[in-house]
Amino acid sequence: MNKKNGPSLGHNKKSLLKSEVEHIDITSFDSRKIIESMKKMSFTSRDTAKAAEIYNEMINDKDCAIFLTIAGSTSAAGCMNLYSDLVKYNMVDAIVATGASIIDMDFFESLGFKHYQGNQFQDDKVLRENYIDRIYDTYIDEEQLQACDKTCLLYTSDAADD
């Protein structure tokens, strides 16, 4: 670990891309007790408990359609399986996401590529020299991202020809 408790700063691609981001499995634990205990706390803890209560009401209301909107890099940060589980277990009815979330994160990983734990303090010059892109403290292999883009281009080119 280095300053600011991040993964150690490396200087070559192999050392920079050594720790894969692991996606959370919401089926592996029960968070209800800790969230319920947050009702008696302050700040965002209490807000989280209140949000959970509202969400439970929404789930139990058969006339309520729940849309999950995703912007930002939460898929790359380890929430990818969370979204599919929310659909699988009827906890959301629809997902609306940005192109970056769908292509550069979800589709990217469906091709077998990974996101890696990084460090927000890593020198951008070192990253660029190693063809690594940074999403805050997450790394992505630029060459793999280009392969993802080329794959998308193949599909969209075929669709445009139809």
Question: What residue spans do the PLM features occupy?
Answer:
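Metallocofactor- and cofactor-centric catalytic cores in central/energy metabolism, strongly enriched
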Residues: 2-137
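Active-site- or DNA-interface-adjacent structural scaffold in DNA-acting proteins
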Residues: 139-149
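Conserved small/polar residues in nucleotide/adenosyl-binding loops
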Residues: 155-160
